[in-house]
Amino acid sequence: MTWQLEFSKAATKDLKKLAAAGLKSKTQELLNVLRGNPLQNPPPYEKLIGELAGLYSRRINRQHRLVYRIHEDEKLVDVLRMWTHYE
């Protein structure tokens, strides 16, 4: 079953930055994985902890992460951020 993706305003802006940085194809690969199964491994994902508990993260590259929330009952993935968490 295909999962629906919803993008936050920040994630939409991040996608433009990633395209400009030459990371669009890697990001699209990860988004396709999320559409198929957001808990598929590989590629590996991390469950976030602390204030971000309930969220998941996947590496786009060494610096950038795709951060998302899963709504199992709705088969929905909220894509929250896709840019560096170091800024």
Feature annotation, model-predicted:
Residues N32-R58:
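A short, surface-exposed loop/turn module that caps and links secondary-structure elements
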